[in-house]
A protein has these predicted regions:
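Carbohydrate-associated surface elements
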Residues: 149, 166
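A short helix/loop element that forms part of the nucleotide-sugar donor recognition site in Leloir-type
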Residues: 75, 173-181
């Protein structure tokens, strides 16, 4: 079985997280298993379901500049304890630079950056996020995006593959009983 480490901020019920769960619920989990590295110390909405589907959830330090020394220490230990991960797939846009850098240093052969945004929030990490955006191509060896604009934004070129977001269409089929309510 192949285990893929999905890197996210958390697994609360939001757009990216729900899309990942749609994929996860529908893959052949006998052949491929998703595990999740989150950046929140507390349990998220989907954690119990992930475990029930055979996945694992790891809690890394938050990606705040003051936590970077602790983050790098955590990730160095994480990769030393988990050599089973040969594929890491990061969904945290320009911040993917940090986990993918540590994965590269640890010798993880497949490092995927996945762009889901077309801009960077102008928060206190704005300058760092811009710098990380310029470094992402040096640490990721596969580039994915949910759309062309998101890909061009993060990678600053056309060297990426577009994977449209997964939507469970059955949730949106007409249902007379639901309409009656």
């Amino acid at each position: 079985m192949i285990r893929i480490l999905q890197v996210v901020n958390d697994m609360h019920r939001a757009g990216l997280e729900t899309m990942l769960m749609n994929y996860y619920r529908n893959i052949d989990r006998e052949r491929v298993q998703f595990d999740f590295l989150t950046h929140r110390p507390e349990k998220s909405d989907y954690d119990d379901e992930i475990v029930s589907l055979g996945g694992k959830v790891y809690y890394a330090p938050r990606l705040y500049p003051q936590n970077y020394p602790a983050y790098f220490k955590y990730m160095k230990q994480f990769w030393a304890e988990h050599p089973e991960y040969k594929i890491v797939h990061s969904h945290i846009d320009s911040m993917s630079y940090l986990p993918l850098l540590t994965a590269k240093k640890a010798g993880v052969p497949v490092r995927i950056a996945h762009s889901h945004n077309t801009s960077i929030d102008k928060d206190f990490k704005y300058i760092l996020k811009q710098l990380f955006r310029y470094g992402i191509n040096s640490v990721a060896n596969y580039h994915l995006a949910c759309g062309s604009e998101a890909g061009r934004f993060l990678y600053r070129n056309d060297d990426f593959k577009v994977i449209p977001n997964a939507v469970d269409a059955e949730q949106f089929y007409f249902n007379a009983d639901v309409r009656a309510d």
